[in-house]
Amino acid sequence: MSSSAGISRRRFLKQSFAFSALASFASLSQKAVAFSNLASAAPQDAFAAEILMIGDWGYDSNHAGQTAVAAAMRKYAQQHGLKPEALFFLGDNWYGDLTGGAQSSRWQTQFEELYPASEFPGLAYAVLGNHDYQMAPADVNKVEAELHYAHSGKSRFTMPGRWYRFQFPAKNPLITFLALDSNMPEGDGAGGRKPGTDRRGFIVMTPEQKAEQLAWLEAELKKPRTTPYLAVLAHHPVYSDGPHGDHTTLIHDWDPLFRKYGVQLYLAGHDHDLQHLEFEGHPTSFFLSGGGGADLYNLKIQQSQRGPFANKVYGFSQLSVTKEKMTLRHLDSDGKLLHAFSKTPSGKVLIAS
C-alpha cells in the first residue's frame, strides 16, 4: 500500500470510525472494519445470488453515457459468466417527456434493448426518482406510466407500487428489500412554491402518502427477520458527498429507524457518481450508484474527508449475496473495478479500495 493511500485511509478512519492506533484494522463498538488491496478483492462466487444496479439512467437527450454503461454491464456479465437474477433501477428512470406514457417508444429503445432479457433474465426492480415526478401531470404522468408499464405483464420492469417489499432470490431468499419513494414534500407550499412541489418545483408525494409510507416502513421493519440481510432502496441518498448533500428529511424520518432495526444496507442514486459511506456506530452501509447515464456531477466532499469511496464517473454496481456475506462492487463504464467491500450478517465490513 502506498503512503498516499495509507494517509487517505487513516483520514477516513479518523473521520468515520474513531481510528484506533492500537491496530491497523479498526475494531469498533458496532462495526468491525478492515481494508484489503483492491487487486485481491473478493473474487466472483459461483454460488452467490447476483444483482446489477444503476441509477439516473433514462436521459432524454444525449444517450452516450447510458449506452456505454449498458454495454459495460453486458460485457461484464459475459466475461464473468453472470446471469444476474435481478437488476435494480434506482430512480430517475425517465428524464424529460415520456410521450405515449406506458406505450412510449423509449421503453423499447432505452430499456428493453439496452438491458435485454437474453443477458439479464431476472426482474428489473425500480424505484421513483425526482425526474420521474418531473413535469407530471403537465404532459404525461410518468409515475402512473411506470406503474402501468410494470403492471402490463409484458416486461421485466417491476414496480408493484410506489413502495413495496420483496425478498431475493425468490427461492431460498437471503436478503429482504424494502423499496421506498423518497420524493418528500418538504414544507408543502412553503417559500412561494406551488403546493405539492419540492424545492426545484418538481411534483412530489403528498403529505398523506409520506405518512402512510413511514408507517408502512416501520411496520415492515418490526416484522421478525427471515433472511440474513435487510436492505432499503430508494432514489435519494440519506447521506451523500455529492452536490445534493445529506437529506435532512430522510435523516429525520428514516435514519432513526435504520439504526433502531439494524438495516444493513441502503441503496440510492440521485447524485451522478458512485459512492460508499460508512459511519461510526451505524449499522447501515450507504451505497450510491448514480452513474447510469445522466450528466455527471462534481463531488462536494472528497473521499479523503468522508468515505471510504466517492468518484465522479459513469458506471454500475454489483451486489453478490451468500449466507456468509454480501459483496458490493462499483465498476466504471469500461467494466473496471473501482471499489468493493463485503459485509457479514453480524456487520463486519471488509473494504477493498
Over which residues does each language-model region extend?
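N-terminal secretory signal peptides and thylakoid transit peptides that target proteins
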Residues: 2-23
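C-terminal segment of classical bacterial N-terminal signal peptides
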Residues: 26-31
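N-terminal active-site segment of His-dependent metallophosphoesterases
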Residues: 34-105, 241
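Extended active-site neighborhood of metal-dependent phosphoesterases/phosphodiesterases
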Residues: 74, 95-228, 245, 249-265, ...
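Conserved beta-strand->loop/alpha-helix structural units within folded catalytic cores of enzymes
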Residues: 87-93, 233-236, 259, 263, ...
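Short acidic, glycine-rich surface-loop motifs adjacent to enzyme active sites
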Residues: 225-241
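A short C-terminal boundary segment appended to hydrolase-like catalytic domains
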Residues: 309-353
